[in-house]
């Protein structure tokens, strides 16, 4: 990739930013970085500048960035627990700031957004006594447990079953059916986290909605703070389970892109197959 090509692409990205098309500009930056990575090229200071402009701070290359971009990379670095530190992107940082301020947040963002980083950072910084995390499946509960246990088992009792004895500080990671076992066992919960909260609506998941809605209402009564997550919700109508919560929507904040490709049969060209190829530059979530 010639320097002149990089310059032309960066010029177009700058035009998009000037015309308030930030989401499109971010997509073009990701495409540029993917191409540079595949060709084994370094990020120039100009490329690092536009990484910063679109808020993808974790992608900044400290080896080639100017001191301004290096400062941003360090400024957004956050403790995620267990000695792990990560640089958050701009949208993650906005959500974490609101949570640390005590706000109740309903967040809609794509899977690649890195919502789990925000949870870990909140626990590491705020150090709440009791956290309840409701997840859609037992498999996801186990996956979340492994992550949380690795970082916080020295400070908290990590609970995934219905018959555990509570300690002074607890993190419960449960499907909604199991969460009922702890209704009435807490005087208060410092943080209630619900993944895929939109499934409390019967229009999305009739089989899960009743038990999830009941769990959200009962545990929500004693929760000092709530953080609800969903992948692609564009708005929230007035309802009982998100009453009083602030809706933050980042459905267009992409940290990866999906490129459609076409695969033709060599013989006869009889079929056309559409494939989806996610392009991921570095691990965000």
What residue ranges belong to the model's regions?
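N-terminal helicase ATP-binding lobe
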Residues: 1-276, 280-285
């Amino acid at each position: 990739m010639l320097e002149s090509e990089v310059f032309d692409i960066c010029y177009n990205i700058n035009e998009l930013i000037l015309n308030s098309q930030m989401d499109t500009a971010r997509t073009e930056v990701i495409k540029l970085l993917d191409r540079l990575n595949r060709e084994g090229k370094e990020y120039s200071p100009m490329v690092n500048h536009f990484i910063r402009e679109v808020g993808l701070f974790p992608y900044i290359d400290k080896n080639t960035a100017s001191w301004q971009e290096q400062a941003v990379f360090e400024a957004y670095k956050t403790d995620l627990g267990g000695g792990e530190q990560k640089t958050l992107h701009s949208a993650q940082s906005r959500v974490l700031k609101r949570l640390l301020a005590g706000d109740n947040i309903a967040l809609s963002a794509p899977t690649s957004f890195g919502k789990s980083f925000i949870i870990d950072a909140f626990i590491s910084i705020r150090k709440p006594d009791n956290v309840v995390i409701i997840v859609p499946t037992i498999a996801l509960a186990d996956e979340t447990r492994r992550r949380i246990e690795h970082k916080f088992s020295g400070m908290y009792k990590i609970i995934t079953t219905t018959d555990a004895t509570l300690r002074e500080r607890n993190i419960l990671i449960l499907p909604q059916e199991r969460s009922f076992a702890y209704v009435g066992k807490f005087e208060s919960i410092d943080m209630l986290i619900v993944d895929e909260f939109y499934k409390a609506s019967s229009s999305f998941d009739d089989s899960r909605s009743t038990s999830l809605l009941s769990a959200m209402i009962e545990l929500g009564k004693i929760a000092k703070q709530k953080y609800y997550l969903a992948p692609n919700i564009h708005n929230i109508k007035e309802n009982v389970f998100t009453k009083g919560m602030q809706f933050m929507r980042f459905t267009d904040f992409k940290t990866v892109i999906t490129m459609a490709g076409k695969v033709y049969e060599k013989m006869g060209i009889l079929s056309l197959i559409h494939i989806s190829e996610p392009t991921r530059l570095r691990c965000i979530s």
